[in-house]
Regions:
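Conserved acidic residues
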Residues: 80, 130, 152
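Short, glycine-/Ser/Thr-/acidic-enriched flexible segments
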Residues: 3, 43, 61-62, 86-87, ...
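Glycine-rich phosphate/diphosphate-binding loop of Rossmann-like nucleotide-binding domains
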Residues: 26-126
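Rossmann-fold NAD(P)-binding glycine/threonine-rich loop
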Residues: 136-178
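Flexible, charged surface loops at secondary-structure boundaries
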Residues: 124-128, 147-149
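N-terminal ligand-binding/catalytic initiation module
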Residues: 1-25, 38
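Structural motif
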Residues: 55, 131-133, 155
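A short, structure-level motif marking secondary-structure boundaries and short turns
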Residues: 23-24, 52, 150-153
Length: 178
């Protein structure tokens, strides 16, 4: 549409295109990688420990990439919970990100991942983790559940996962939102 309006070829204007038509190399990882870099800097600045437990609400593209990149880029960390549109799972001893991605691709869901137990969707957001990645739904963290968020860092990979009212509560509770 932009090219139609301007009447010129401009491949750099929009993302998520194949490389052959001007897409960006690294696009697949871009959202998650940017989030992880921001988490790394927040941890360095405020003394948080990225090698502790983390959870991902929304195990789609961004959530999967964050799970895979977290350990690689932050020197460790234990994924203890993940959710998708069909349900949520947890294992306090950790979920292997690579195996979970494979399982999701094979079955279409995180549910029934070996060694995990099913938990309510909303519980993923309220677990006692160092870092929480809301990577699925707008308004997932809202006035009703913000007081229950125990993460020290919330790294928003979804579009608008935290409502303005919830953001005020998180700020008051010293939860850092990226």
């Amino acid at each position: 549409e932009y090219e139609t309006i301007t009447k010129r070829h401009s491949p750099g204007v929009f993302t998520d295109k194949p490389l052959q038509v001007g897409g960006t190399e690294g696009r697949r990882d871009a959202t998650a990688r940017g989030g992880i870099i921001s988490v790394r800097e927040a941890c360095n600045a405020y003394g948080f420990d990225p090698t502790k437990a983390f959870a991902i609400q929304g195990f789609g593209d961004a959530g999967q990439r964050a799970a895979l990149l977290h350990k690689e880029m932050l020197g460790g960390g234990k994924l203890i919970a993940a959710s998708d549109s069909r349900g949520a799972i947890m294992n306090k001893n950790g979920l292997d990100p690579e195996e979970l991605v494979h399982h999701k691709l094979k079955t279409g869901s995180v549910l029934k991942f070996p060694g995990s137990k099913e938990i309510p969707h909303e519980q993923v957001l309220e677990l006692d983790v160092e870092i929480l990645y809301p990577a699925a739904l707008e308004n997932a963290i809202n006035i009703k559940n913000a007081k229950n968020i125990k993460a020290r860092v919330v790294c928003e990979l979804a579009n608008g996962p935290t409502t303005p009212e919830a953001d005020k509560i998180l700020f008051k509770n010293n939860v850092h939102v990226i």
